[in-house]
């Protein structure tokens, strides 16, 4: 029993319309908004701050499983997204799976621990300036009470046959990382108990094929037993270490977890859960499910705020809330992940969630992801910000642009924008059009987003800044949208080859290079004003920078 689910792109440089305050009427453009549309104006005054820029978007990012993190290509890609997108933590499954070699027992049944693979992985993560958001799971085979597994790599999802051994195992692991990295470092980590225990695929299995209503109470009680033992194991090493959960799919069991920890006095330092913007479903173990994106513009956003409300009404008011998985879709075979639509989708959620969540960990940074085994094509709807060949998808640029925003956010008149400044005197404006173009349940994502989807015109955007310091600047404009830094469309245009030659990879890399569509000099006068218009299409994203000229 699983919860219900549905059955089964060369860069184009867009014309920019320039109109500094003293300029003449802007020239016409074939990409202008229809005459019936009003002008969309984005105004900000550099003297009017909104406050520090909220960096919850770069707090954490996800990956498939720990063993994949031992690969050179995985490590190369993580180093790149760390540098470009600023991610600070990384979370993945399978830390305790048998392919990590962490646990055996001798002939007397005594534990034999081995942390060599984990050391290799954590040393790399630590060495590039990141930290692990540790998911405690799955169950080592020697400790498992059953044989139920999940995914191609066979993660055991059964409870421990001896909870005392599990607790000692967790404590020994935490003690080991403390000795290796120091308690001050480990105090900055997070220990999350298990993954999506409200789904039978991830917890206990369901050999009797019970309905969810019949299965869930027993599974939840067993998870709370695992949670309490895990928390004791973590806290036995250092009471200041952070432990949390329930890491559920679909924001389930939040109130029950808060109540359990209150009543049983079990430690709960943070709350975790997951959300995907599909109409139904939570798990696609084989990568064959059909999905439909929710037509609700507030999908994910409203759920995050609802969970925050539950926490604030509990004894844990003010607790950190981490969404340790989120994306447009829960399946690793959904072309929306490769599509230009994803960039605006991500930015809309980051803007509107605001401070309701401490972090939103995008699932995932890479297509090197083998839950349903290795995939057979370079673009297959994988979760990643990067594909196998290190090619950035539009979703990657959403996070890169967010990372390039200055630390001081300015008040903006436009709800689909961030305007910031940095300590160097530069200004950054990030704005987008978010339009759900999917027609609804009549067609699944796997059909709709696999097809060419030209973007229709949207309102022309006018960026109007005031309070800009007089002087010379570079105006640098980077764009993502249909056929602009849109590698899926470029791949489709070359015939969607299943295997890429080196020449084809080079062509695609040029198509998603992230090079500016405009880089020119501008002069800001004594009035401190800057105005420029930008033609918009559905789901276009613009990143605009005013960079003070270097004085000679």
Pin down the residues of each PLM region:
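Bacterial N-terminal signal peptides
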Residues: 7-18
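Short, well-ordered amphipathic alpha-helical segments that serve as non-catalytic structural scaffolds
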Residues: 173, 300-310
